[in-house]
Amino acid sequence: VIGLGSSFLTDAIGATLNWRISPYVTLGTWGGYTKSNAVIGASGTVETTNWMVYLNFPDLFKQGNLGGIYIGQPPKITSSNLSIGNVPSFLNSAGFASEVAGAQPASTTHVELFYVHRLTDRISITPGLIFLFNPLQTSTSDTVTIGTIRTTFSF
């Protein structure tokens, strides 16, 4: 059984592109791939992919502020031959295991909107919204909506 004490040897590759279309718009993307081989506590391999596309709007409404729209896929198991399926035992025991052997049956889509509002040169507040469609990589899961607010102090 794969648990929190299991060890994996992982090879990972990723790429990022960022294009400043104008002083007020940047377009970017990133993607990644991992292949993990179980070495202690289990046997088998797991492959995952992830990606994101985004638009940033520097100086939106005021110099120093930033708006952002991000759309992507969190890490998704695309292939697995682990003996217990495609998720660790702590997720299996919680009832989140995939019913499809070898890969997760659907893709989670992450949509994020945020706005960095600079209050002073050293303090900013960032409200945001995150939507997770098909969470846990299953099409039967309800959409999750998360509201966020972050305060940043710069020294």
Residue ranges and their predicted role:
Residues 53-55, 143-155:
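Outer-membrane beta-barrel "beta-signal"
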Residues 1-7, 14-18, 28-132, 136:
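Outer membrane beta-barrel transmembrane domains
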Residues 8-11, 23:
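Extracellular beta-solenoid/beta-roll
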Residues 136, 140-142:
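Extracellular/periplasmic helix-loop-helix junctions in multi-pass membrane proteins
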